[in-house]
Amino acid sequence: MRKGISIPILLAVSLSLLPAAAPPQAEIDNSLLNAKLYLPDAKHGYYQGTRFDWSGVIYSLEFEGHNYYGPWFNRTDPNIHDFIYDGPDIVAGPCSAVTGPVDEFAPLGWDEAKPGGEFIKVGIGALRKPADAAKYDNYKVYAIADPGKWSVKKYRDSIEFSQELSAAGYHFLYRKTARLIPGKPEMALEHSLKNLGTRAIQTNVYNHNFLTLDHHPPGPGLTVSVPFQIQSNHPPNKKLAEIRANRIVYLDILKDRDVVATPMEGFTNKVGNHLIRIEDTRVGAGMKIQADRPLLRESLWSIRSVIAVEPFIEINVAPGAEFTWKSTYEYYTLTR
């Protein structure tokens, strides 16, 4: 068994007289891929929003001179809801200011939580429901009542996160591993959710997959393809992109406030439909995402600085049971 380096998660409030600490981070490498990640930390962490899972925000992944992930925004502002355009800048709010392939879980226990009570976001913790909240808002920062017990173990080519939380009637152990596959330009994101309580866990999760390939704006030469004929009741702006059978093809460079977004329907419950290819002939690189669970739904969203294909899966975990899922990312170059 390999010995990992245990990294303490700093959840206590530090002395105000100390200088601001840099966000804790880690680096993993398999000689083909190099990835850099921010670590979960309630005080000094890079991401402190209450929308996305805190376990391992990948802010850089390099392969053959290409970089796949990085900030899609120029700066952040705690007063922004989602993001805005401010002159030439894209300004992200605290819940959206994140990078790379990040997971967002649907909240647990929101409806039954009383004002001031607690609800759950897996990968974040038990959050406080405001007194004036009518419905859940994933762009709002909620107070964290209990972050749970976190641990991180780092190896040369992988990093393991775990969070145990007992709150709001739920008790679970969540694990996530970012693993670079030996001898291959591939990264696996391996997840498990074990129900340690007496209440069933019913939720869903998707990966936002913020892709900023070499920081080129989406445009002609960029395609998204899947194994099924894409159907959409809200197709993209026909001047910017179009659906062609199983592909979405970009027709013009996204600029200013351009948006290409569409639901991607037409898949079946076969696991083989959970596969995505994104290729850009302008930069000569691409990636394939393949998962081992059937799709619940899928959508595409892109602006001038980023493209994101968002696959959802359903999660149902009975008391005492464990649910696992894995997504494999393959990175490659294209022959020009």
Residue ranges of predicted features:
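Bacterial N-terminal signal peptides
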Residues: 8-16
